UniProtKB/Swiss-Prot annotation:
Gene name linked to the record: scpA
GO biological process: cell division; chromosome segregation; DNA replication
Family: Belongs to the ScpA family.
The organism of origin for this protein: Bacillus anthracis
Name of this protein: Segregation and condensation protein A
Function according to Swiss-Prot or TrEMBL: Participates in chromosomal partition during cell division. May act via the formation of a condensin-like complex containing Smc and ScpB that pull DNA away from mid-cell into both cell halves.
Locations listed in the record: Cytoplasm
Length: 247
């Protein structure tokens, strides 16, 4: 059964690289290419496994990273160093580093502009009559605590855990579950659990097909603003809450 799912919040390969740099506390001026290439390719592989619509620029960046990695492995000859002793320009990572720094600045400016726009909207809109509804509107516009890249990392961890727990011999019975049905099941499950549950507890079935559908259902519920995904710190457990619980 095929599930073609496009997630608009994936902003591109530079966004993914910045996410990895932040997640693993990497110095943007001294990127460990081998490590970040491995992590990047792992994310792209997971995106393909989930049948997300992976844009071609992700694959171009993967090729670029592999090329930089191969150049970093080449022996450095003395004659390749510039006469002034500054070998920084010869660093194969230089161009990528500059692109990441520029993109990071762009993202910061875009975030600031969005915040100012929201502030102006609050100042110049009609006087609020119902303060409860206003509070709900503001909460709806708040950014999610967890990015989709964090969700991919959590799914990778989940798959590794399920694989380790799985018996050596298993009998697979294929089930086809529509994403819409799984979305309804998740909302009911959250209601039973008081509106909040661990992300990992949503995946009670070990069958890969159902796990994929569950993950895509979570993404769809996030996009529809029917659930909130929360994580206190990097690598902490992720929790799923319904909007009615968080309001």
């Amino acid at each position: 059964m095929q599930y073609n799912f496009k997630v608009e919040a994936f902003e591109g390969p530079l966004d993914l690289l910045l996410h990895l740099i932040h997640r693993y506390e990497i110095d943007i001026y001294n990127i460990p290419v081998a490590e970040i290439t491995e992590q990047y390719l792992s994310y792209v592989h997971t995106m393909k496994e989930l049948q997300l619509d992976v844009a071609s620029e992700y694959l171009v960046m993967a090729a670029t990273l592999l090329q930089i990695k191969s150049k970093m492995l080449l022996p450095k000859h003395e004659e390749d160093v510039l006469d002034n002793g500054d070998d920084f320009i010869d660093d194969p990572r230089q161009e990528l580093m500059e692109r990441l720094i520029e993109y990071k600045k762009y993202k910061q400016v875009a975030t600031e502009l969005k915040e100012r726009e929201q502030e102006r909207a609050q100042l110049y809109t009609r006087p609020p009559i119902d303060f409860t509804s206003l509070q709900q509107e503001e909460e709806t516009n708040l950014p999610l605590d967890v990015t989709l890249y964090d969700m991919l990392a959590a799914f990778q961890k989940l798959m590794r855990r399920k694989k380790a727990e799985k018996p050596v011999t298993t009998r697979i019975t294929r089930q086809e579950i529509p994403i819409e049905q799984r979305m309804t099941d998740i909302l009911k499950q959250l209601e039973i659990q008081g509106g909040r549950q661990s992300f990992y507890d949503l995946f009670v079935d070990d069958e890969r097909e159902i796990m994929v559908v569950t993950f895509l259902a979570v993404l769809e519920l996030m996009k529809n603003q029917q659930i909130i995904i929360e994580q206190e710190h990097n690598f902490d457990e992720i929790f799923v809450s319904s909007y009615t619980k968080s309001a």
